[in-house]
């Protein structure tokens, strides 16, 4: 590696006619920035003449037109100066593969050799050094670090910003502890050479400096860990008074410390009711519409009760986003209002937390015989940096590459590895620390999954508590169903099988063989081969079982195009399935017995810490395999009040088969083991009523006999002034006119609407098929409309990434299905128009819905009125709530489903919404109304 000029970096950025130089695409602009001795010493940019047409989308993205290239120099004219700058330097680019292939293509066309020096990718470097960022686009990084980036997608500006980003990242790299740099050097052999160069130079500098270890780090067993914040738990917690009006009132404590404070009567009412139910030991259901400030309304009485009882109050949410919002935004605001510190601890399931002992063992492996993949190396580097920054060790903080999440399965905490007696890292480990923090906290913020696990499996993960708030409570019934149900797939078995490492020189076999060689008298030399044969036999039987299952299920249900296929275990478990399952069951027991036997035998030997960790991993894998076999058995055994179904891919491949089971009705379980075991539970959400009634929620959650108190709080927004609901009367209907005509009408309506809205449009669909079909029809028109389109499943499935891209473009359309109907906050100009394509009824072939409906019909009830309609109304209200998020928002809601006006049940949807102007008219009239709404002088 050439280190003579290791302090010189040349950043290159190119704008091109396309993405494929091998197909003739050419550079049309090149930007360059020289970084030398820690400073940007030179910047330059130039248009580049070429004989290719500039595609319209490139011109729209960059602003470069063919006129700009008329007098531009050729690349061959620019090449000598570029090569002079590159002499002895490390070449840097943001997405180096792209820029380097174009640069080398042009160099070779001009008669020069391609660049052969060190290269550095700032995307790779940023991913490594900033492992918790949401994204690594240059514009996002510039915004994150306050770098001036006036002309995105112009080569000169992009190169200069990348140069300043490089300097920031080098500064961070050189500030890392020496032990972290040592670990990085050992695990980045597949990164770009420039990255290795930077790490090597940082190591040299830090090794010779007098401040090798910053006081903010704790160096423990070759890891640099962030020191946890000192706690002052020796001080007695101060009790607080409770007076909702004094706290939330117009001249209350909150008004004096919050610049965005708005007095809301509903907030006061909710706080008082939560307080009263906590005091009286009663349950409360609160529907708090958007804008009522429900989070603070329950946090204030929750802290009061916690201090009064000297015991934590638990707050449970469905989504990670709300957990973080409560911890990072709402609790600090409450602290300011109360004028005292509040201890709020986030506690999740064990698998969310990193096991340091496993991580240390993995590092030892990749420094030895194990060959780590590129994704594993990048993930390890991210984890090493993250350890210097995280106090929680929670994977939710990380933005790992795709392969990194498979690695996490190896590194996450589990009961075998995480015990005080056998873990050298126990005093530093994150999961025990999280549990300890929870025991001392005023508020424990957790998720529905852990809450339900604690109740139904009696794991005692959560400390003892009497008072609970369930936010996002409209998800509780579904979450409980998932928890009380089960699923298993062929792929899950394969992941377990691969962890044994039967086919590779890695995994358990490679490691256990080394241990056996070190203790030859303890275990027979033939042991590994015998175990491999057992596992290969078990693998064969798994294949046979899933082939038999797929055949039996498809034979039973000829609708092979259906995504889900219901089955009854007694119908599917024919002779072939039964015999295959018994062979799998027996083979699995043999494997588990043999591997547990060797751990017992080897534990009698004098083992190294690494060997101890390996045996813990063996036990964990045996437990996982045993659990998987038990779950599969439950999916092949009929139980009353359960529904069973299977899913596979379009080709019905057995290796893509997944089996599910769910309880049809969980009201009895919730009533008996959940609500009866907690003194006071507050259930809250923005969507819990249908037509102003809580009865559907009460029935679903098993609260019929409990008689909870109910409170419905209307929104403080003036919907009659801020929004309108518009329904086109001339729109086709899917049932009568066909899906193709309906889809074409949706696309045409959207195209027509863009000129009136002139801003962001959110489109909510009820199926992925609809999203893809409308997106396909819209795509050819987006350039003419000067709009960007982001569609779930077309532009990716990452919701937060799609929302961020949507918000970054002023004229954009975001299309999504289920997960986009709730949980995304798009205030103000972020959404000007909301399109609800169809009323969100559950698919009629949904297995759980079908089973529930059948049960209701069997008892003489109407499945439509008691199940389908309430579900759809609650989902509709969630979607409706995406538009108006603050008192200053204005926007239009278009419902392209005439049933909301024409069907008898349509009024149930309308009566569940706040009062606002509703118009049922031809499309042209609604588009004219939209034009008037957005251009009446009240908005730009």
Locate predicted features.
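Conserved non-catalytic scaffold segment of RNase H-like nuclease domains
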Residues: 2-118, 131-153
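Acidic two-metal-ion nuclease catalytic site recognized across multiple nuclease folds
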Residues: 2-4, 168-241, 245-246
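A substrate-engagement module of RecA-like helicase motors
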Residues: 224-230, 241-252, 310-312, 316-442, ...
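Conserved pre-motif I regulatory segment
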Residues: 238-285
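Walker A/P-loop
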Residues: 279-301
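Signature of the SF2 helicase/ATPase Hel1-core->accessory helical subdomain module
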Residues: 324, 415-443, 447-586, 688-700
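A contiguous, basic/glycine-rich beta-loop/short-helix subdomain that forms a polymer-engagement track
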Residues: 409-442, 452, 457-459, 588-731, ...
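Conserved RecA-like P-loop NTPase helicase motor core
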Residues: 717, 728-741, 793-900
């Amino acid at each position: 590696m050439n280190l003579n000029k290791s302090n010189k970096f040349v950043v290159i950025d190119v704008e091109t006619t396309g993405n494929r130089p091998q197909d003739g695409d050419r550079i049309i602009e090149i930007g360059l920035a020289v970084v030398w001795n820690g400073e940007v010493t030179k910047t330059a940019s130039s248009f580049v003449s070429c004989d290719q047409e500039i595609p319209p989308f490139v011109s729209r993205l960059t602003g470069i037109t063919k006129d700009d290239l008329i007098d531009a120099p050729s690349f061959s004219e620019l090449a000598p100066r570029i090569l002079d700058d590159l002499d002895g330097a490390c070449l840097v680019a943001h997405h180096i593969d792209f820029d380097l292939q174009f640069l080398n293509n042009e160099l070779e066309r001009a008669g020069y050799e391609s660049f052969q020096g060190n290269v550095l990718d700032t995307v790779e470097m940023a991913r490594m050094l900033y492992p918790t960022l949401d994204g690594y686009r240059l514009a996002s990084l510039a915004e994150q670090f306050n770098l001036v980036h006036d002309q995105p997608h112009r080569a000169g500006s992009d190169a200069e910003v990348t140069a300043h980003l490089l300097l920031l990242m080098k500064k961070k790299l050189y500030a890392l502890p020496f032990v972290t740099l040592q670990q990085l050097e050992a695990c980045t052999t597949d990164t770009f050479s420039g990255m290795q160069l930077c790490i090597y130079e940082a190591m040299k500098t830090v090794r010779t400096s007098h401040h090798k270890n910053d006081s903010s780090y704790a160096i423990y067993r070759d890891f640099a860990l962030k020191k946890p914040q000192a706690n002052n738990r020796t001080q007695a917690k101060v009790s607080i008074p409770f007076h909702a009006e004094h706290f939330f009132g117009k001249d209350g404590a909150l008004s004096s410390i919050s610049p965005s404070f708005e007095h809301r009567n509903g907030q006061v009412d909710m706080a008082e009711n939560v307080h009263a139910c906590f005091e009286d030991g009663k349950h409360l259901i609160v529907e708090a519409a958007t804008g009522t400030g429900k989070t603070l309304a329950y946090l204030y009485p929750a802290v009061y009760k916690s201090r009064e009882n000297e015991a934590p109050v638990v707050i449970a949410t469905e989504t990670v986003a709300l957990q973080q919002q409560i911890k990072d935004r709402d609790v600090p605001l409450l602290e300011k209002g109360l004028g005292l510190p509040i201890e709020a601890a986030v506690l999740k399931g064990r698998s969310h937390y990193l096991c340091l002992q496993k991580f240390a063992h993995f590092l030892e492996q990749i420094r030895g015989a194990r060959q780590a993949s590129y994704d594993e190396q990048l993930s390890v580097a991210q984890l090493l940096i993250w350890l210097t920054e995280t106090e929680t060790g929670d994977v939710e903080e990380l933005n790992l590459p795709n392969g990194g999440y498979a690695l996490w399965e190896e590194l996450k905490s589990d009961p075998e590895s995480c015990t005080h007696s056998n873990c050298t890292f126990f005093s530093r480990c994150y999961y025990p620390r999280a549990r300890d923090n929870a025991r001392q906290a005023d508020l424990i913020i957790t998720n529905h999954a852990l809450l339900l696990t604690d109740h139904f499996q009696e794991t005692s993960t959560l400390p003892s508590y009497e008072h609970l708030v369930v936010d996002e409570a409209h998800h509780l019934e579904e979450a409980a169903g998932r928890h009380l149900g089960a699923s298993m797939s062929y792929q899950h078995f394969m992941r377990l099988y691969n962890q044994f490492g039967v086919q590779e020189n890695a995994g358990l076999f490679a490691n256990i063989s080394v241990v056996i060689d070190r203790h030859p008298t303890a275990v027979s030399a033939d042991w590994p081969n015998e175990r491999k044969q057992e596992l290969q036999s078990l693998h064969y039987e798994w294949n046979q079982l899933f082939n038999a299952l797929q055949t039996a299920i498809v034979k039973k249900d000829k609708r092979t195009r259906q995504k889900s296929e219901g089955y009854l275990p007694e119908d599917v478990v024919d002779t072939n399935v039964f015999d295959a399952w018994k062979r799998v069951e027996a083979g699995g027991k043999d494997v588990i017995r043999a591997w547990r036997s060797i751990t017992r035998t080897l534990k009698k030997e004098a083992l190294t810490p690494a060997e101890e960790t390996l045996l813990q991993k063996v036990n964990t894998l045996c437990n996982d395999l045993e659990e998987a076999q038990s779950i599969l058995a439950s999916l092949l055994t009929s139980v009353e009040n359960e529904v069973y179904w299977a899913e596979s891919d379009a080709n019905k491949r057995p290796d893509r088969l997944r089996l599910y089971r769910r309880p049809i009705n969980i009201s009895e379980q919730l009533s008996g083991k959940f609500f009866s075991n907690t003194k006071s539970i507050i259930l809250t959400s923005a969507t819990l009523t249908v037509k102003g009634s809580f009865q559907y929620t009460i029935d679903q959650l098993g609260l019929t006999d409990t008689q909870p108190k109910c409170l419905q709080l209307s929104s403080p927004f003036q919907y009659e002034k801020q929004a309108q609901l518009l329904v086109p009367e001339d729109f086709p209907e899917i049932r009568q006119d066909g899906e193709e005509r309906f889809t074409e009408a949706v696309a045409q309506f959207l195209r027509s609407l863009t000129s009136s809205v002139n801003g962001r449009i959110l489109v909510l669909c009820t199926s992925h098929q609809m999203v893809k079909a409308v997106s396909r029809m819209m795509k050819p028109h987006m350039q003419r409309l000067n709009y960007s389109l982001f569609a779930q499943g077309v532009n990716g499935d990452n919701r937060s990434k799609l929302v961020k891209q949507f918000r970054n473009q002023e004229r954009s359309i975001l299309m999504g299905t289920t997960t986009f109907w709730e949980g995304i906050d798009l205030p103000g100009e972020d959404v000007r128009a909301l399109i609800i394509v169809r009323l969100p009824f559950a698919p009629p072939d949904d297995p759980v819905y079908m089973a529930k409906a059948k049960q209701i019909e069997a008892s003489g009830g109407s499945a439509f009125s008691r199940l389908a309609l309430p579900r759809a109304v609650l989902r509709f209200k969630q979607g409706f709530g995406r538009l108006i998020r603050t008192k200053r928002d204005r926007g239009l809601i278009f419902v392209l489903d005439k049933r909301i006006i024409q069907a008898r049940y349509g009024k149930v949807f309308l009566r569940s919404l706040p009062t606002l102007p509703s118009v049922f008219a031809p499309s042209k009239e609604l588009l004219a109304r939209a034009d008037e709404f957005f251009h009446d002088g009240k908005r730009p």
